[in-house]
Amino acid sequence: MSNDSLTRKLGFWSALAIAVGTTVGSGIFVSSGDVAKAAGMPSISILAWIIGGVIAIPQVMVLAELATAYPQNGSGYVYLNKAGWRPLAFLYGWATFWALDPPSISIMALAIVAYLASFFPFFVGIAGKLLGVAIILIITSIHYRSVKAGGSFQVIITAIKIIPFLIVIVLGLMYMNFDNFAYTPVAGATSSSLIGGVSATTWAYTGMAAICFMAGEFKNPGKVLPRALISSVLIVLGLYTLLA
């Protein structure tokens, strides 16, 4: 199906929810400990999250420019194809479909199951793997049936993920006790630890480019996509920094 025959049904809030929702996931849970360990000090850990988000800003600005110039489904495949690199475009599409997205989806599903298993031990082992498969199939079927329904689902699921974080942040600010800010730095922790901390944030800031893969589904993509991409990185940056 060509992009001209697509019915553009999604707006800014769907784009923002998809960008934020695909970014804020298992990354913050998996990476937070790695960032703290690599940084060695709370101040360096917080700074690492800030720098990691700042580094992501130029990336999303480039994506915003490309998505505005070529508002078609396909993301990198379209951009490389338009640049005249058709073999590289094919390799990008092939690698994304077979090598990049499936492991990412599997990791996120297994992360959900792992956290559920801490409350419900039944989901340890084969039962957990089956639950992970079921989660993937259910979410896939929702998006397959309707683009608009998929967008609405993404708004809801993103809100469900973000609200608990906001509650933790608000409660932390309300009951802040500066006596708890005393800490013992990890031996050998120096400013050079910042590099390791920033590197550990990389996984947590990936995902915003997901909306570029479906640029042909958005109404007025020239305005919606840049606003959604830039807003999403700022929201995620603020969220991660406050959680750190």
Question: How would you name each of these model-derived features?
Answer:
Residues K9-A19, S45, W85-W98, L131-I135, ...:
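Select transmembrane alpha-helical segments in multipass membrane proteins
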Residues S2-T7, P42, I46, F123-A127, ...:
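Helix-loop-helix junctions that connect adjacent transmembrane segments
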Residues D34-K37, I57-I136, T140-Y144, A149:
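Hydrophobic transmembrane alpha-helices that form the core helical bundles
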Residues V20, V24, L47, I51-I55, ...:
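Lipid-exposed faces of alpha-helical membrane segments in multi-pass integral membrane proteins
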Residues F29, V60-L63, A109, V113, ...:
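Alpha-helical transmembrane segments of polytopic integral membrane proteins
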Residues K148-I156:
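Interfacial loop-to-transmembrane-helix boundary motif in multi-pass membrane proteins
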Residues V20-S31, P102-S106, T202, T206-A209, ...:
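Short helix-kink/termination motifs in transmembrane helices of multi-pass secondary transporters
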